[in-house]
From Swiss-Prot:
It is found in: Cytoplasm. This is UDP-N-acetylmuramate--L-alanine ligase. GO terms for biological process: cell division; cell wall organization; peptidoglycan biosynthetic process; regulation of cell shape. SUPFAM superfamilies: MurCD N-terminal domain, MurD-like peptide ligases, catalytic domain, MurD-like peptide ligases, peptide-binding domain. It catalyses: UDP-N-acetyl-alpha-D-muramate + L-alanine + ATP = UDP-N-acetyl-alpha-D-muramoyl-L-alanine + ADP + phosphate + H(+). Pathway: Cell wall biogenesis; peptidoglycan biosynthesis. Its EC number is 6.3.2.8.
């Protein structure tokens, strides 16, 4: 590619999926430019690495580019897309560019409705501990690396495979992981769950004959597609028929202690430095891959024990002063689907038994809120106190019956929790100051702008002091 394409421009370069690919390309020696609507830590990092960053979208931004990379979130009438089309510059989907990177190395693609980012991070961390020095492209910041992407010298590239727009069908890895299959992004599949499952089957057909599909058999939908996978399958999970499974699971001190059972291997005692049964499952995927690639048990144990997590995935901010003179534990999480939220809430209950759980939640997308409305009501009813914001639209038109206010009214009707509704994320710090008490565990959650709230909370407390 490099003898033809020397300058690559990214429209929306600050996004999690785009920025990782851009960083790897910068490190490969390409001239990289990009635009976004605002600056963030990611754009600052890319600029420091040598990328040219423009704030705002303008036709002039693509000057000199041999290719323009877009995600499905970029509209066709974006001025940079229009300019590229007018100038005859190839417009490349993000997943297609990721597929090009995978052609340079042996790809390990992590797919599934939930858990992709954490599982990708665990796989990258375990392979790195085993001396394989992988390249990785992750949808969140790997805290130990301080970045969501890295160009390694080894043979493997570990990346998330996105089913939300079916773009994972562009990838041709040698190892695939399927963590679970759940009803999300159903607009892509015509609201037909069978079509979604078929897409995952087609994903496994991208594997070479020597490749393998590493699948979580605890998920009933994954289990249903196994008979249709024509390539070698490695089953992991907590189920008795899993080839890589966890037994004797014990949650202590915010960590998960368990024994790994693998066919033909001695039992392996593991401590995972993060809470939650779902993260045990994610770790098993990493263990299965690492075992297959010859990583030593010592390296596996070390990587999991020292895993520092991923930004916005049960990310701990420590103890924060509360308005009553005490302090509460602050955690931030990216969860935005009821299944993910339930797993995070369960992890918090396990890590902090007996403590009151306060959730500040920003729903993400009106269509998801509409499609999962009852499930949102059920999962939000399980916390002890709730601050709820208006839906983060992510470019969608508002749906009045699926608004944050509508969700709030439905929760009050059920009667298990009385939500404090705020119109904007900017109102969350004040609302939490009134709700949070000494000894509470407070979780800010959502895939939208609520990710900036933890830093504001700390600042809010300092200003009040």
């Amino acid at each position: 590619m490099k003898h033809i394409v020397k300058h690559i421009h990214f429209v929306g370069i600050g996004g999690a999926g785009m920025s990782g690919i851009a960083e790897v390309l910068v490190n490969l020696g390409y001239a990289v430019s990009g635009s976004d609507l605002s600056r963030n830590a990611v754009t600052d990092r890319l600029e420091a690495l040598g990328a040219r960053i423009a704030i705002g979208h303008d036709a002039a931004n693509i000057e000199g580019a041999n290719a323009v990379v877009v995600s499905t979130a970029v509209r066709s009438d974006n001025p940079e897309v229009l300019a590229a089309r007018h100038q005859g510059v190839p417009i490349v989907q993000r997943a297609v560019m990721l597929a090009e990177l995978m052609r340079l190395k042996q790809g390990i693609a992590i797919a599934g409705t939930h858990g992709k980012t954490t599982t990708t991070s665990l796989v990258a961390s375990v392979l790195a501990a085993g001396g394989l020095d992988p390249t990785f492209v992750i949808g969140g910041r790997l805290i130990s690396a301080g970045a969501n992407a890295r160009l390694g010298t080894g043979d493997f590239i570990v990346a998330e495979a996105d089913e939300s727009d079916a773009s994972f069908l562009n990838l041709y890895p040698v190892i695939e992981v399927i963590t679970n299959i759940d009803a999300d992004h159903m607009d892509t599949y015509g609201h037909d769950f069978a079509r979604l499952k078929q897409a995952f089957i087609e994903f496994t057909q991208r594997l070479p004959f020597y490749g393998s599909a590493v699948v979580c058999v605890d998920d009933p939908n994954v289990r249903q597609i196994i008979p249709f996978i024509s390539k070698p399958v490695v089953r992991y999970g907590l189920s008795p028929d899993a080839q890589v499974r966890a037994e004797d699971i014990d949650a202590r001190d915010g960590r998960m202690h368990f024994t790994v059972i693998r066919e033909g291997r001695a039992p392996l005692a593991v401590v995972l430095n993060m809470p939650g049964l779902h993260n045990v499952q994610n770790a098993l995927a990493a263990i299965a891959i690492a075992t297959d690639l010859g990583v030593s048990d010592d390296a596996i144990q070390l990587a999991l024990a020292e895993f520092n997590g991923v930004g916005r995935r049960f990310q701990r901010y420590g103890d924060v002063p509360s308005a009553d003179g005490g302090q509460y534990t602050l955690i931030d999480d990216y969860g935005h689907h009821p299944v993910e939220m339930a797993a995070t809430i369960a992890a918090a209950r396990g890590a902090f038994p007996g403590r009151r759980l306060v959730l500040a939640f920003q729903p993400h997308r009106y269509t998801r809120t509409r499609d999962c409305f009852d499930d949102f009501v059920n999962v939000l009813s399980t916390v002890d106190a709730l601050v709820l914001t208006e839906v983060y639209a992510a470019g969608e038109a508002a749906i009045p019956t699926a608004s944050g206010d509508a969700l709030s009214r439905a929760l009050r009707a059920v009667g298990k929790v009385d939500p404090v509704f705020v119109a904007t994320v900017d109102d969350v710090p004040d609302a939490l100051a009134k709700v949070a008490q000494n000894g509470d565990v407070v979780i800010t959650m959502g895939a939208g702008s609520i990710g900036g709230v933890p830093a504001k909370l700390v600042q809010h407390i300092q200003q009040k002091a």
